[in-house]
Swiss-Prot record:
It comes from Drosophila melanogaster. This is Small ribosomal subunit protein RACK1. WD repeats lie at residues 13-44, 62-92, 104-134, 147-179, 191-221, 232-261, 282-312. Involved in the recruitment, assembly and/or regulation of a variety of signaling molecules. Interacts with a wide variety of proteins and plays a role in many cellular processes. It holds the Pfam family WD40. Highest expression in the mesodermal and endodermal lineages. GO terms for biological process: cellular response to starvation; cuticle development; cytoplasmic translation; egg-laying behavior; IRES-dependent viral translational initiation; locomotory behavior; mitophagy; muscle cell cellular homeostasis. InterPro entries: G-protein_beta_WD-40_rep, RACK1-like, WD40/YVTN_repeat-like_dom_sf, WD40_repeat_CS, WD40_repeat_dom_sf, WD40_rpt.
Amino acid sequence: MSETLQLRGTLIGHNGWVTQIATNPKDPDTIISASRDKTLIVWKLTRDEDTNYGYPQKRLYGHSHFISDVVLSSDGNYALSGSWDQTLRLWDLAAGKTTRRFEGHTKDVLSVAFSADNRQIVSGSRDKTIKLWNTLAECKFTIQEDGHTDWVSCVRFSPNHSNPIIVSCGWDRTVKVWNLANCKLKNNHHGHNGYLNTVTVSPDGSLCTSGGKDSKALLWDLNDGKNLYTLEHNDIINALCFSPNRYWLCVAYGPSIKIWDLACKKTVEELRPEVVSPTSKADQPQCLSLAWSTDGQTLFAGYSDNTIRVWQVSVSAH
């Protein structure tokens, strides 16, 4: 028996690149997505076999430029977004309204995250800083000492309460690990030879993976700071995510998604949508964002053709 992924449907409604997707830990029938069309969409998942996999239940307006990132609070009631309009916004999803605007970055906000307890917020920006905020939109700390020397492309909290850290990466080719208690640098991870787009922390907080221009996914041990190993790809890595319940890493590179079984470092599946267009690489929609459902059975992927594609894990007898 082996596990494969089948394309189950699409979510159509954005008018710009789908830059990020967040699944709702409390409600398996809704997800939220961010786009270059300056909106967030809350999707109701209907899982229709023939037509769309769901429909836009709510569209959230407020940002005045591309939205680069979105995350959900652990209770699923609030969304946090970051935008090229230099702000973050906290949204009450039931009301469909912004409850807080976070101002302080001097350039585009590229990444946002919630701490495990939802009390702290971190953001990364093209202004080369990382900012820590509370949920009242007060900036508590700006990390500049030992900071990135170029755009901060991604910031993430570790889900591990016993090791409170922030992981960041940037266009300076560096992955940095920060001690959350004092906002001081804990580790620098060097090994990439191109700008970095994304970093993600494993569900148990023991390791992280980074990727970008050099097409390599590097895995790092967050406890001792060592580079564990490298997974090679043949295109720019745009997104990374760990499965919540299997030892899998998903890598979005160029138009493709590769799912790695980290136990044996072998490919489980390679996903590439069949897009009806001339087969030149330039015309293939790029995969920009990835998110697993909480149960690890459904993979949502956002693309540069404004579409979300939905894959489902199925067991096949070989």
